[in-house]
A protein has these predicted regions:
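P-loop NTPase Walker
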Residues: 1-83
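Short, intrinsically disordered/low-complexity patches at protein termini
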Residues: 49-50, 92, 100, 168
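Alpha-helix boundary/capping detector
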Residues: 52-53, 101, 173
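A generic membrane alpha-helix/interface feature
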Residues: 56, 88-90, 175-176
Length: 177
């Protein structure tokens, strides 16, 4: 079976099984000198980001180089920080708690901002996707419209490793395309 048949491109969403060459497809798409698209490439892991930046640096001019960021940074930078005041006007994110062991055992049972934030304002990794979806819903499409003004194309790598709630964010992005 031809490798290209295993790669599915829907709008600007690339999904393929491990080893199918999707990272190379992303690199080649970004290296295309025929277009001058403003691109964002999102990947789940730090190692994935480092690999993409290294490979893209080898084939993209400075003007072609896409923004590369992690999934959690994407949710914080483009969903939570700009639109959090819609849900929680008095909360200011101060950090990010990645380590699940640092989360209170009962934070999922809590209501309001305490479900998503520690007492000092740090965002819990486990509830960040849920918070991002709630912020997007409350913004009534403003999050996706803003992303559309910033980027012509959003490419997500390593999507097979993200959480179910994170897939809701991707679904929202695809529905805006």
């Amino acid at each position: 079976r031809d490798q290209d048949e295993r790669i599915i491109v829907i709008h600007n969403f690339v999904h393929a099984c491990a080893g199918a060459g999707k990272t190379e497809l992303i690199v080649q798409r970004c290296a295309n000198t025929a277009d001058q698209k403003r691109r964002l490439v999102i990947t789940l892991t730090d190692s994935g980001q480092a690999e993409l930046i290294s490979r893209l640096s080898g084939v993209c001019s400075k003007s072609q180089m896409p923004d590369v960021m992690g999934w959690y940074a994407f949710m914080i930078r483009h969903y939570v920080r700009p639109y959090l005041p819609i849900l929680f006007p008095h909360v200011r994110p101060t950090g990010f708690i990645f380590d699940r062991a640092m989360h209170p055992k009962d934070h999922f049972k809590l209501g309001g901002s305490r479900r998503y934030f520690s007492s000092n304002g740090s965002i819990y990794k486990e509830t960040l996707p849920e918070l991002a979806v709630k912020v997007a819903e409350a913004s009534q499409g403003a999050v996706e419209k803003r992303l559309g003004r910033i980027y012509d194309e959003i490419i997500i790598d390593e999507v097979q490793d993200i959480s179910r709630k994170s897939l809701d964010i991707i679904e929202r992005l695809l529905s805006q395309a």
